[in-house]
């Protein structure tokens, strides 16, 4: 680590570990159990504390706060951690808080994500790869977000909710139920509006397969009879469609939340 990459006003606790070419800007504060891997850049006024690891090539902008204790009354100073992967862009005022005893003690963020201004990632969240969270997205604790999902600005997600891969949540949406993979949800109380067909096309999914999957989803959520029976019927009917299979797998997993449904 070259001292020329560390601004003279930065406060770095003894014990912090830096990789190669780490850059720390003015007035940053780094705790004693923080690990910054190669080419991490902290612009200025960034606070990183706790047992926290930041992956290589991640850039963090002013006034972000990473690794602070979770916002829960039952937190008892347990030594929980925050792990953030590589190639992330973390913009101004983003907060990512450490895990808790009730959630495995780790808040984990993957790689290649863009978190815009004011995003909050609560304790024990498990965040995937290649995501976009627009301005002021707020995630409560214990939320799981699959790869390539997009969450629109000022949306809030209820604790323990699952957001499936390639899904999209429109801006200003409160989400209190699980969002299926590829799902498109929005509204004052987030409802399923179909599949994220535009996003799927951009990611190279076959158009026919995507439209077939939309038909399958409509059969599951809008069909007659028992919901569980419809899942089984659709799983068999569309067993050769990998998109449908991914959605069915998601629906069959254990969850403490219900699912976002079409508006009745």
UniProtKB/Swiss-Prot annotation:
One Gene Ontology term of the molecular function aspect: acyl-[acyl-carrier-protein]-UDP-N-acetylglucosamine O-acyltransferase activity
EC number: 2.3.1.129
Top-level EC class: transferase
InterPro entries: Acetyltransf_C (IPR029098), Acetyltransf_C_sf (IPR037157), Hexapep (IPR001451), Lipid_A_LpxA (IPR010137), Trimer_LpxA-like_sf (IPR011004)
Single Gene Ontology BP annotation: lipid A biosynthetic process
Compartment list: Cytoplasm
Catalytic activity, reaction form: a (3R)-hydroxyacyl-[ACP] + UDP-N-acetyl-alpha-D-glucosamine = a UDP-3-O-[(3R)-3-hydroxyacyl]-N-acetyl-alpha-D-glucosamine + holo-[ACP]
Pathway: Glycolipid biosynthesis; lipid IV(A) biosynthesis; lipid IV(A) from (3R)-3-hydroxytetradecanoyl-[acyl-carrier-protein] and UDP-N-acetyl-alpha-D-glucosamine: step 1/6
Cross-referenced Pfam families: Acetyltransf_11 (PF13720), Hexapep (PF00132)
Gene Ontology CC: cytoplasm; membrane
Record keywords, A-Z: Acyltransferase, Cytoplasm, Lipid A biosynthesis, Lipid biosynthesis, Lipid metabolism, Repeat, Transferase
Complex and partners: Homotrimer.
Family: Belongs to the transferase hexapeptide repeat family. LpxA subfamily.
HAMAP family per record: LpxA (MF_00387)
Function: Involved in the biosynthesis of lipid A, a phosphorylated glycolipid that anchors the lipopolysaccharide to the outer membrane of the cell.
UniProt-recorded name of the protein: Acyl-[acyl-carrier-protein]--UDP-N-acetylglucosamine O-acyltransferase
Annotated gene: lpxA
């Amino acid at each position: 680590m070259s001292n020329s990459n560390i601004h003279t006003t930065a406060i770095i606790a003894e014990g912090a570990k830096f990789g190669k070419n780490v850059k720390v800007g003015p007035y940053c504060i780094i705790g004693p159990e923080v690990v910054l891997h190669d080419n991490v850049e902290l612009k200025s006024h960034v606070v990183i504390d706790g047992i926290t690891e930041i992956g290589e090539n991640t850039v963090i902008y002013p006034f972000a706060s990473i690794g602070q204790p979770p916002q829960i009354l039952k937190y008892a100073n347990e030594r929980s951690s925050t792990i953030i992967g590589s190639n992330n862009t973390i913009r101004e005022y983003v907060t990512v808080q450490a895990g808790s005893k009730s959630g495995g003690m780790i808040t984990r963020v993957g790689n290649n994500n863009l978190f815009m201004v004011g995003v909050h990632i609560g304790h024990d969240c498990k965040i995937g790869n290649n995501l976009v969270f627009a301005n002021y997205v707020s995630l409560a604790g214990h939320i799981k977000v699959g790869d390539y999902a997009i969450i629109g600005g000022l949306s809030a997600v209820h604790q323990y909710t699952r957001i499936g891969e390639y899904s999209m949540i429109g801006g200003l949406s409160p989400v209190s139920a699980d969002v299926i993979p590829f799902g498109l949800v929005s509204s004052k109380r987030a409802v399923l509006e179909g599949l994220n067909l535009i996003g799927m096309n951009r990611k190279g999914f076959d158009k026919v397969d995507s439209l077939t999957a939309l038909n399958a989803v409509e059969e599951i959520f809008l069909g007659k009879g028992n919901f569980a029976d419809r899942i089984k019927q659709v799983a068999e009917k569309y067993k050769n469609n990998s998109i449908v299979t991914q959605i069915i797998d998601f629906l069959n997993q254990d969850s403490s939340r219900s699912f976002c449904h079409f508006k009745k």
